[in-house]
């Protein structure tokens, strides 16, 4: 499963009603042929991959064939690279395409690297492990991008039992996760609703329950605890920063441990406010545009440039794929840096840099465009955000234009992952929409 069907297909369903009228064109075009789905040799080859990891191999083969792709690039986070060679062998065996693996680090969906793939001569990119966060250029008809979420099945019964043993009945719980576990999360929420006041919050354009390291929803005050399904703390800390007064728990699906988690909000905010205070007396500014895939936002960079120009503050532009203290120390004449790449780099590692390293939001505070916010905003990719120092600011209004597909839940079952409306331009649309069973 990779995303919702195309907007025109969804609109056709709403006009004709479920199960009535002509089949939507999007579904017919994207339906995987039986000769691929039922190919015994392909099914045998897929058995080499972990059975609980859904790499959507038949769908990938069909999309490559549809596009008549000649050279395919695969991009995936390091945790999935051990499966790359197997996937390459399968795709080259069952398609006419040459397949290559892009080995540069991939931190998230913001790192989708169609630029490098094109430069290497690829006409098709498969991006694994992340949702459709970055819109693709619809004018490039000779290049296609397919997002594969890599849905991971886990021991859902153990997750449910752990929650029941930890929280008393009728507790108000918010469940969040990364895209790999969102289907399991939403199905678990359905099971728990009879015993708890369960919510699966959404921060559009993300799927219900999905959070990023830089983007998380602000939860209602009545929520007593947030439960994060996933390994590691990076994404969990995002929702903790956005909701400092709500207890946070993490269920690791690999160790099968449900643990209480804590975050030093006071220390983090003190460090960031100190950096902002120092920046206000800066005489020269440096603007960093991240070049790791699509991580950098030219729109935000242009906004920062216009603000500094209006205030008569000199600045220099710097393009970097990864930002290290040693690199910035080579430009000692710059008094303060603003990085348009990953906000968490400043939040988590800002004190490691010799000069203040601000996020675009913190730069807005330093330039007095906005006051310091409580709680600290985690809205970098949110459609509804504080200002033009975020990627999708104003997009919530664009999504209300008549004829556009509204983002939300699929009726008749647990909500499916839903990409941004601009995802109509990429190749990640599903051929089916159906609830995921426990």
Curated annotation (Swiss-Prot):
One function term, GO molecular function aspect: metal ion binding
Functional pathway: Protein modification; peptidyl-diphthamide biosynthesis
A biological-process GO annotation: protein histidyl modification to diphthamide
Enzyme class: transferase
Record has S-adenosyl-L-methionine as a keyword: yes
Record note on quaternary structure: Component of the 2-(3-amino-3-carboxypropyl)histidine synthase complex composed of DPH1, DPH2, DPH3 and a NADH-dependent reductase. Interacts with DPH2 and RBM8A.
Name of the protein in question: 2-(3-amino-3-carboxypropyl)histidine synthase subunit 1
Organism field: Bos taurus (Bovine)
Gene name of the encoded protein: DPH1
């Amino acid at each position: 499963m990779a995303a919702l069907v195309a907007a025109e297909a969804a609109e056709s369903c709403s006009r004709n009603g479920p199960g009535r009228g002509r089949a939507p064109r999007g579904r017919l075009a994207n339906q995987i042929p039986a000769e691929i789905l039922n190919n015994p040799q392909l099914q045998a080859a897929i058995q080499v991959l972990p059975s609980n990891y859904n790499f959507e191999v038949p769908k990938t083969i069909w999309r490559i064939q549809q596009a008549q792709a000649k050279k395919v690039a695969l991009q995936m986070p390091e945790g999935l690279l051990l499966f790359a060679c197997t996937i390459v062998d399968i795709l080259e065996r069952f398609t006419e395409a040459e397949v290559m693996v892009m080995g540069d680090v991939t931190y998230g969906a913001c790192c989708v690297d169609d630029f490098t793939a094109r430069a290497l001569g690829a006409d098709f990119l498969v991006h694994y492990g992340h949702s459709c966060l970055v819109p693709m250029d619809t004018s490039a008809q000779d290049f296609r991008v397919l997002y594969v979420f890599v849905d991971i099945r886990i021991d859902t019964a153990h997750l449910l039992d752990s929650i029941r043993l930890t929280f008393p009945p009728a507790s108000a719980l918010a469940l969040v996760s990364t895209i790999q576990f969102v289907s399991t999360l939403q199905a678990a929420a359905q099971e728990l609703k009879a015993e708890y006041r369960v919510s699966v919050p959404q921060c559009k354009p993300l799927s219900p329950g999905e959070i990023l390291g830089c983007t998380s929803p602000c939860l209602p005050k009545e929520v007593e605890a947030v439960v994060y399904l996933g390994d590691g703390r990076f994404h969990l800390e995002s929702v903790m920063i956005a909701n400092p007064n709500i207890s946070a728990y993490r269920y690791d699906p690999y160790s099968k441990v449900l643990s209480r988690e804590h975050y030093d909000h006071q220390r983090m905010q003190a460090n960031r406010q100190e950096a902002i205070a120092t920046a206000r007396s800066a005489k020269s500014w440096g603007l960093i545009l991240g070049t790791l895939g699509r991580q950098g936002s030219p729109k935000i960079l242009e906004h920062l440039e216009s603000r500094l120009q209006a205030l008569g503050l000199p600045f220099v532009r710097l393009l970097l794929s990864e930002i290290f203290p040693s690199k910035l120390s080579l430009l000692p004449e710059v008094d303060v840096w603003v990085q348009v790449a990953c906000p968490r780099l400043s939040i988590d590692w800002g004190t490691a840099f010799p000069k203040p390293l601000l996020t675009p939001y913190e730069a807005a505070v330093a330039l007095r465009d906005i006051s310091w916010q409580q709680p600290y905003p985690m809205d970098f990719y949110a459609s509804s955000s504080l200002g033009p120092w975020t990627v999708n600011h104003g997009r919530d209004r664009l999504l209300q234009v008549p004829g556009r597909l509204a983002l939300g839940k699929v009726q008749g079952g647990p909500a499916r992952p839903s990409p941004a409306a601009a995802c109509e331009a990429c190749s990640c649309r599903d051929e089916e929409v159906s609830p995921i069973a426990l």
